[in-house]
Regions:
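Oxyanion-hole/transition-state-stabilizing segment in secreted/luminal serine hydrolases
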Residues: 97-114, 123-165, 170, 181, ...
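Structural recognition of the beta-strand scaffold that forms the well-ordered cores
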Residues: 89-91, 114-117, 141-146, 179-184, ...
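N-terminal secretory targeting modules
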Residues: 1-92, 97-102, 107, 137, ...
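Solvent-exposed loop/turn segments at secondary-structure junctions
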Residues: 95-99, 119-123, 148-153, 186-190, ...
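Catalytic His-Asp segment of secreted/periplasmic serine-dependent ester chemistry enzymes
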Residues: 187-266
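Carbohydrate-interacting regions of secretory-pathway proteins
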Residues: 165, 265-465
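Acidic/histidine-rich helix-loop elements
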Residues: 57-66, 101, 109-125, 152, ...
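Charged, glycine-enriched surface loops/patches
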Residues: 161-183, 201, 205-216
Length: 465
């Protein structure tokens, strides 16, 4: 006869295998993904598997007494709310996600959200509990932050990234159209066994994972929080691991920019009307009046030099013929899209990709151009003024104007560009960016996409006498 402990362990493995089979049926389409969670959900065993035998993924799963209790208690509570959490936006991760606590719902009042964070969890632990805790909810979307505890346990970044890739593949198999926001692992400290070089390597691998996953948006929450040395700031992470209220507020702002593009928040246009004497360059509804222009010989040569000298250089597609996007909501690849009154430069799956959208019209007369922009963390975009580019970025993180005092991270900021002759005077929220940027005597207005997501709105121009 088997010892009792061994028998219990084997029964737990059998039960876990059965749950994986149920999840497989859901993701393969044998069972409708729209049906509610199975009645047996609450009867499942939520104990940490006794061994790694037969478990998906690789790397550490914690089994300390405190973690086993946390895992069991949290997952039992998840089962109790499985029905009411159907179709929610799921926040998935470890103690940082669990730490949203009572902040989560007020942070996103427009959304039905559910918290599936388990303190102490690892990427493999998330992979193990994914079918019951997440897939069974048929989520509207998933926000994933995981990996920091794996590093503390000594797992190599490649092991962690492999598990995250499996998580993303499982989510895609369940619902290919379901958006996933993959958050970069937050900065911490070598004193927490989470050195900056390991975190940076892991986030680099995460960016690689999403290149062939169009439903996944990578959100640079590392740069959002890192200090000059690449570690957590004590004023936002008192223990150098978990964010405080300030940290969660910054994370909220970063997520809201992405949620707006996904159609989760900011779902209505503000019906903007241009100021007296101004005309709108963007009609709030589609890309009429905008298009692609042939890539210049100078840009083609710049791209070749950059890509030859730097393996990490941005992709830079060459446009051979002009293309107009009148009456279209988006460009064919979705990089530029009209969404609820905003002209959005979406985050590229390649992480960096140089693309340019231009007005079909050119502007030979002096003018004042006004617009507002909202940047996701560390975004790099730009505004072309008759050709030359004014950098438009998440300035405090991405530069070049890091000393701005009135810039509002994660919120709307106003750019005003006054062109007279061959000089452009440029401000952001009233602060001077450029006093005399040299521009040609005529040319179009353009928007650039490089890294991250940028939203533009209220794009209006007034020609001067």
């Amino acid at each position: 006869m088997l010892p009792r402990a061994s028998l219990v362990s084997r029964l737990a493995i059998v039960a876990f295998s059965f749950l994986l089979l149920l999840a497989s049926l859901f993701t393969s389409g044998c069972v409708s993904s729209n049906r509610p969670a199975p009645a047996s959900y609450t009867a499942a065993s939520f104990s940490v598997p006794a061994t790694d035998d037969g478990l998906p993924g690789t790397g550490p799963i914690r089994r300390a007494d405190w973690f086993q209790k946390t895992w069991h208690d949290r997952r039992t509570s998840f089962a109790a709310t499985a029905q009411q959490d159907q179709g929610s936006v799921v926040f998935l991760g470890d103690s940082i996600t669990q730490g949203w606590g009572d902040r989560l719902v007020p942070s996103f009042p427009e959304l039905h959200v559910s918290n599936r964070g388990v303190s102490g969890d690892t990427s493999r632990g998330v992979l193990v509990r994914l079918p019951e805790d997440v897939l069974a909810l048929n989520p509207r979307g998933v926000v994933l932050l995981i990996g920091t505890n794996d590093l503390e346990e000594g797992a190599a970044p490649e092991i962690i990234a492999g598990n995250v890739k499996l998580i993303i593949e499982s989510l895609r198999q369940h619902d290919p159209a379901m958006p996933v926001v993959l958050c970069a692992v937050f900065p911490s400290s070598a004193t927490k066994k989470r050195p900056v070089d390991q975190i940076k390597r892991l986030n680099q691998l995460y960016r690689t994972i999403v290149r062939d996953q169009p439903q996944v948006t990578y959100l640079d929450t590392w740069t959002l929080f890192a200090n000059a040395q690449g570690d957590a700031k004590s004023e936002e992470f008192p223990d150098l691991l978990h964010p405080n209220t300030i940290g969660y507020a910054k994370w909220t702002g970063a997520l809201r920019t992405i949620f707006a593009t996904l159609g989760f928040v900011d779902t209505k246009s503000d019906n903007f009307q241009p100021e007296a004497g101004f005309v709108s360059l963007f009609n709030d509804h589609d890309l009429t009046g905008w298009g692609y222009r042939p890539t210049t010989a100078q840009d083609i040569e710049s791209a070749k030099r950059w890509q030859k000298s730097d393996p990490a250089a941005a992709a830079w597609p060459v446009i051979k013929d002009a293309v107009n996007f009148d009456h279209l909501k988006a460009t064919p690849d979705g990089r530029f899209e009209a969404i609820n009154g905003r002209l959005v430069v979406t985050s590229p799956h390649e992480y960096r990709k140089i693309q340019q959208l231009w007005t079909q019209r050119e502007f030979p007369r002096d003018f004042i151009l006004k617009l507002e922009f909202r940047a996701a963390p560390n975004t790099d975009s730009g505004i072309y003024v008759r050709g030359p580019q004014l950098q438009c970025r998440d300035y405090l993180l991405a530069g070049p104007y890091k000393a701005l005092k009135h810039y509002k991270a994660g919120d709307w900021n106003e750019i005003v560009i006054t062109v007279k002759g061959e000089a452009a005077y440029c401000t952001c929220n009233g602060e001077v960016l450029e006093t005399a940027m040299k521009v040609p005597l005529t040319g179009p207005i353009g928007l650039e996409g490089d890294r991250g997501q940028m939203e533009y709105r209220h794009i209006q121009l007034k020609e001067l006498p």
